[in-house]
């Protein structure tokens, strides 16, 4: 059950897909160029060796070899991207505990709220896990072994709530945050944002060290990463507002989500922890609040979330309605 399909969101999705498609094509092209260049160097030595033994290969022999080099390199590159995504999903989930195994007073309320909200929008109840960190976090992801990009909606996502978030919020605020995450699931945001993050990770894979521009390929990788972040931001800013609206509708309490956002904003450190920064490219766009610090909020090109003021104004307007 999709909760929002306004034209503006469709336009954002098309624009983001175009940007991300360009980035992915560029990344694959760079890998292919490197592979072909290596193949040409190899063919130079190979030609000398074949000439020494007096063997003349067919005219198309070396172009075929170069093509196979490009095909093999791009195939390995894609496999590397898949491995990176699965590793990052696993890294986030390995520090979490199933809700049923956590001894907290709020466990029963969280479980019943997740079931009730999922039933409201006609989706399977998502798995809820608890992260013991005191940093307020609420995000949605897939299992590490789930398909990277799936054409169906059979995969049940996992919602992760941190102990810090649970202790910070009241029950109504916690329910509103759960509704926000379930709104993302109902709107298929997780699957769509994963599609957009693949080109970003592909571009980042071309750069060995953050900030390094030691050769033209790394320079291109940084440029493509910047462009990919623009595409992710264009899409995710609109989806965050849509998830806020969905949460307000499901909970019937826009003020509860507004209060939760204000509390979380006040309790969030301006400098995210290293592990959050390391994995932000796979998780940041589906976190109720950004994990990249101030640069991730607002109207800037790289912002993944709207400003707090924009989100609160939308919720206030829903309250008035």
Question: What does each model-found stretch correspond to?
Answer:
Residues 80-194:
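Peri-catalytic and regulatory segments of divalent metal-dependent proteins
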Residues 105-123, 213-284:
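Short helix/loop segments within enzyme catalytic domains
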Residues 169, 186-189, 234-237, 251, ...:
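Residues at alpha-helix boundaries and short interhelical turns
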Residues 189-221, 264-265:
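Post-HEXXH active-site segment of zinc metalloproteases
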Residues 180-181, 243, 307:
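DG-centered beta-turn motif at the end of beta-strands
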Residues 122-125, 129-151, 249-321:
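Active-site-proximal gating segments in proteases and membrane effectors
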Residues 17, 21, 181, 185-189, ...:
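Loop-to-transmembrane-helix entry motif
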Residues 1-131, 204-207, 221, 225, ...:
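Hydrophobic or amphipathic, alpha-helical segments that drive membrane association/targeting
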